């Protein structure tokens, strides 16, 4: 849904802005637009020209025009717009704002085509347009009904909610019914005009208008790219790249009319270094064309390319599809090796950066376990297993107060823990009861600190807990630490990016090496300094991440797959309605390594969203090997 929203400093629109908006809408792979009132004629011209269909609406919201005024306005609107081929439906009011006596007037003035008239949000005249349905909405309607259905508003995108978050669940469910005709995301952009009477602030009227997938200056939020991927007319079937990958994968044609033979696809192979290797730089080592199958809309076939000789030397495969006009449709990426393989291979390629320091040693004195190698030392509380102090070259790195369990309970057992000096390094093995079995810390002679955590491998938790040692509904699960936000200048990382993710909005992110300067952007509110992507939040599939700091930089590497890297806690909007939380609760601490994260809602509570928005659950059976969080920290300077 797009309302007439000029740039913040303006009070009118223009053809150039209409073209910009239409092109942004098409970039999201959308093909239809609705507004709450007749749009500018130049926007309809853009829809006609660029290929967007339009639902033209007589204004009215909850209350309607009386019969005399409604008849005059309906006639003026239809007579003005009737010859625009982009218009496929007339809308009479919105959410109760219709006058039934006006319905027949649309056909009177549209006497050649007599396009269908709908009442947006109502089940009216064989078209069910129910607004903001829950995932299971459908007692004798929607997927369980016998009428064409098309929600004319859904996925409410207030602040960072909705939009592309949870979209896949709804869309896939509705596609199971051939009577599904489409849907309209609310809304295109934040509406925040510049208020010259309020020191030129951009004013979205608190929580009433920061509902956009793009900002007031058309800044792209994370949902922009999530929608673009989920509504791409070319869809990739899920696949991993393993040793058996031969360059072929399944694609589905979700166009309405176009054969896939009219489109093209390319591949690129990226080599992604680590901070220890080349400062964490990306390079392209191969590229070429992908052969797409000649398949009609609705069909699935096999795309393939010939693997270049150096394919296995790469780290990420990037695929990009283009439409028949050569415009990019979507970009996808897959890692060529799993995290542990990537880590081992890169470590083997970086001996020059890993000169030996003095022999690593472990000691336990007065309740403090110390691991030391050269200029790096780490102190642990022997009773809790938590890091107390990290020092590098005489400077304290304020990474501490962890690991703290998230979404579960664990209790360190000092009597079972031990300190050991081994040929592989200085070891502190912290043993636990509850959700954690053990966390082994090992500082090598090169000053690198390894952490190997074994979680959820014992149904009894080793005993000692009278109640459950994990959350019944798992929103966050993993380990968390403290690190002062004031010390951080930025972040460089390899993983999915550049946008933060939610459990139900990972789509739209891709594997690469990314960088962000620190920012405190509040989505949909920080209009004075609206920097996207937001810095704080969850980042998916971390391979490594460097915290940039003038005083306390460090890098952490993941040696297991599927780690969500949480960096700090996003600030809640000040203008949120009645002080209600707009985001799910974050773990305590500042930096977390998680195996599960929460979804974000869209207008209705999480319980009414789809299955991929729901919290996880844990079951442990005898013989389970458990879950792993295996990391390596480089605190060296």
Model-derived features: where do they sit?
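Buried hydrophobic-core signal for structured, non-transmembrane domains
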Residues: 248-255, 305, 317-321, 375, ...
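Residue-level signal for glycine
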Residues: 2, 282-284, 326-335, 340, ...
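Substrate-binding clefts and catalytic carboxylate motifs of secreted carbohydrate-active enzymes
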Residues: 90, 140-305, 311, 553-556, ...
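Beta-strand/loop-rich accessory regions of lumenal/periplasmic or secreted enzymes
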Residues: 310-312, 343-637
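Terminal connector regions
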Residues: 308-348
């Amino acid at each position: 849904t797009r309302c007439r929203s000029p740039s913040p400093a303006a009070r009118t629109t223009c053809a150039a802005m209409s073209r910009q908006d239409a092109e942004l809408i098409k970039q999201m792979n959308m093909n239809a637009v609705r507004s709450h009132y007749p749009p500018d004629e130049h926007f309809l011209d853009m829809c006609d020209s660029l290929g967007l269909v339009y639902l033209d609406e007589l204004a009215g919201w909850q209350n309607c025009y009386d019969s005399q005024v409604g008849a005059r306005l309906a006639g003026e609107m239809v007579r003005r717009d009737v010859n625009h081929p982009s218009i496929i439906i007339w809308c009479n009011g919105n959410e109760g704002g219709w006058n039934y006596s006006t319905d027949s007037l649309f056909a009177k003035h549209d006497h050649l085509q007599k396009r269908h008239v709908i009442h947006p949000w109502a089940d009216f005249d064989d078209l069910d347009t129910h607004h903001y349905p829950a995932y299971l909405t459908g007692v004798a309607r929607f997927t369980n009904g016998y009428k064409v259905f098309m929600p004319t508003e859904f996925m409410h995108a207030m602040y960072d909610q909705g939009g592309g978050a949870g979209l896949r669940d709804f869309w896939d469910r509705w596609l199971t019914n051939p009577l599904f005709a489409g849907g309209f995301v609310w809304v295109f952009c934040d509406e925040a005009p510049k208020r010259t009477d309020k020191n030129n602030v951009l004013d979205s009227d608190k929580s009433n208008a920061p509902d956009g997938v793009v900002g007031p200056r058309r800044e792209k939020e994370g949902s922009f790219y999530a929608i673009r991927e989920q509504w791409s007319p070319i869809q990739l079937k899920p696949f991993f790249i393993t040793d058996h990958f031969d360059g072929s994968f399944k694609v589905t044609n979700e166009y309405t009319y176009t054969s896939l033979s009219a489109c093209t696809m390319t591949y690129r192979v990226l080599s992604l270094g680590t901070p220890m290797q080349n400062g964490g730089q990306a390079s392209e080592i191969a590229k070429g064309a992908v052969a797409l199958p000649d398949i009609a809309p609705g069909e699935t076939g096999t795309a393939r390319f010939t693997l270049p000789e150096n394919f296995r030397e790469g780290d990420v495969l990037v695929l990009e599809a283009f439409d028949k006009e050569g415009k990019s449709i979507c970009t996808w990426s897959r890692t060529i090796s799993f995290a542990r393989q990537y880590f081992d291979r890169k470590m083997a390629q970086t001996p020059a950066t890993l000169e030996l320091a003095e022999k690593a040693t472990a000691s336990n004195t007065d309740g403090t376990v110390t691991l030391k190698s050269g200029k790096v030392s780490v102190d642990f509380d022997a009773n809790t297993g938590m890091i107390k102090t990290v020092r590098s070259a005489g400077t304290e790195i304020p990474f501490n107060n962890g690991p703290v369990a998230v979404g579960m309970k664990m209790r360190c057992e000092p009597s079972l823990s031990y300190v050991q000096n081994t040929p592989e390094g200085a070891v502190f093995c912290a043993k636990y009861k509850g959700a954690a079995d053990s966390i082994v810390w090992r500082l090598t002679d090169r000053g690198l600190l390894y952490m190997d955590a074994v979680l959820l491998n014992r149904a009894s938790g080793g005993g000692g807990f009278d109640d459950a040692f994990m959350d019944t509904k798992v929103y966050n699960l993993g380990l968390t630490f403290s690190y002062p936000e004031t010390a951080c200048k930025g972040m460089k990382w390899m993983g999915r990016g550049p946008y933060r993710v939610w459990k139900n909005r990972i789509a739209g992110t891709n594997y690469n090496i990314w960088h962000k300067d620190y920012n405190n952007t509040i989505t949909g509110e920080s209009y004075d300094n609206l920097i996207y992507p937001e810095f704080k939040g969850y980042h998916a599939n971390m391979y490594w991440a460097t915290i940039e700091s003038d005083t306390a930089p460090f890098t952490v590497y993941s040696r297991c797959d599927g780690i969500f890297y949480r960096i700090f806690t996003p600030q809640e909007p000040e203008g949120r309605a009645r002080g209600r939380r707009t985001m799910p609760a974050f773990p305590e601490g500042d930096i977390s390594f998680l195996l599960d994260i929460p979804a974000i809602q869209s207008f209705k509570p999480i319980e009414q969203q789809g299955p991929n928005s729901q919290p996880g659950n844990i079951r442990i059976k005898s013989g389970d090997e458990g879950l792993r969080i295996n990391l390596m920290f480089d605190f060296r300077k």
